[in-house]
Amino acid sequence: MFDLNVKYAESNLHVVLAHGAGAGLRHDFMQGMQEFLCEKGVNVWTFNFGYMQKAYAEEKKIPPSRLPILIEEYAQVITEIRRREPNAQLWIGGKSMGGRVACHLACQSDDIKGVAVLGYPFHPVGKPNNTRLDVLHQIKQPVIIIQGERDTFGNAQEIAGYSLPTNIGVNCLPDGDHSLKPRKVSGLSQTEHMHAAATRITHFIKGRAR
C-alpha cells in the first residue's frame, strides 16, 4: 500500500514522513531523515503518494495529485499504520508538500499528536504574497517547522513577518535552503542540518509523549 515503509526504533513513538512534490521516499533526504530520527528513538514510517508510485513505475516525472486526493491517500496510510500498531503514539509530517498535506490531515484527525514539517511551503517560489497560512491557523495540535533561512518557499525574514498561532513553532537553520542545504561558504553542511532537524523533532515528540 503506497510503498509503505517503516524503520523501527523499539519505541511506542511513531512519526510518518510524507515526501515532497518532486521526490519520493527513495530520495537521499527522505532516507537520511528516516535514519537520523530512528537513531534517536522514534519509529519512522515513509510512503509514496499514488502519483509518485506511478512515476517510479513508469520512470517519468508526474505532477502531484490535487490536495484533496493527497489528504485522502495520507489518511489511508494512517489507517493502515493504526491497524498494524493500534497502541502507537502517532505524529505525522513530511517534507514540503508532504508536510502541508499532513497539516490539513491533522485538522481532520483528533488522534494525531502533532505535526513535524521539513521546509513548509509558506508560498510558491517567487510569489511571497500568495501565502498558505490558513491551515496553520486552523490546526489545533502542536506543530514544529524546520526551515532553512534561505528557503525560497518562505525564508526567515518573511516568516518573521507572519502572525502565527502559539502552537506553531518555527526553527530556522542557518543559511539552509528548501532542503536545509547551506552554502559551502557557511562552513556548515546539509548533513549537520539534517541531524539538527532530527534532534529538534525528536525533542518535540518526546516532550509531548505520554
Spans of features found by a protein language model:
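Hydrolases whose catalytic domains are alpha/beta-hydrolase-1, hotdog thioesterase
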Residues: 101-105, 126
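Short beta-strand immediately N-terminal to the catalytic nucleophile in serine-hydrolase-like folds
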Residues: 89-94, 118
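Gly/Ala-rich beta-loop-alpha elbow adjacent to hydrolase catalytic centers
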Residues: 94-98, 102
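A conserved short beta-strand
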Residues: 111-122
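Catalytic histidine-centered segment of alpha/beta-hydrolase-like enzymes
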Residues: 176-192
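Conserved alpha/beta-hydrolase "acid-adjacent" motif
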Residues: 152-158
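Serine-hydrolase catalytic machinery in alpha/beta-hydrolase-like enzymes
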Residues: 1-88, 182-184
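Short beta-strand/loop motif that positions the catalytic acidic residue
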Residues: 138-140, 145-147, 151
